[in-house]
Amino acid sequence: MGVELKVCGITELEDARYLAGAGADYLGFVQHEESARYAPPALASDIIEWVHGPAPVGVFVNDGADTINEAVDTAGFELAQLHGQEPAHVVERVDCPVIKAIHVRHDAAPNQLRTLFERYEDGVEYFLLDTHDSSVWGGTGESFNWRLARELAEDYPVFLAGGLNADNVARALETMRPFAVDLSSSLESAPGQKSFEKIDAFMDAFQAAAAELEEAETHDP
């Protein structure tokens, strides 16, 4: 199975349909009202209704389980990505499969990340690693040291986020070998508005890198 692709920050139907046609596996709809990429549940529902293929993901930041479940039901999200500092008991009460984001600090150590994974593993389907930034919860456009997470990606299904683009995705896949990659700001012309030109350039690089990685894994002893 090849590396999967999630694109976050969807606010427009045209962008969602273009990404579906390009081969995205997941589309992320930000449910954090303070974000420039906020897509209210009703708007997300309208877009999801007209897009087939990618799984729609609601992206939440420090919401309670009841709020998350209500938005999931209203919008029709298939997964919930919890991108804040949600406690494990909230994660375990979410009614759909969960992607739990872990924010990687510049001084993080692999054992610290593993401890966080173990704290949440009973209540989640996937993990997502993103670069820590004290001023924002995501869409930083900054990458972290991917080597920190290589062993975690062998043990857990991990989405890799933070600063990925057409120029570095091949190196990211080779270094970490994640389950999926997650992009947002690097595919935009403005916050919440995707650039088809950037999408095309990334897809060319991503598909070539994913195919090369899959071939290498096939020939591994």
Curated annotation (Swiss-Prot):
Its EC number is 5.3.1.24. The keyword Isomerase applies. Pathway: Amino-acid biosynthesis; L-tryptophan biosynthesis; L-tryptophan from chorismate: step 3/5. The keyword S-adenosyl-L-methionine does not apply. It catalyses: N-(5-phospho-beta-D-ribosyl)anthranilate = 1-(2-carboxyphenylamino)-1-deoxy-D-ribulose 5-phosphate. Belongs to the TrpF family. This is N-(5'-phosphoribosyl)anthranilate isomerase. It comes from Salinibacter ruber (strain DSM 13855 / M31). The gene is trpF.
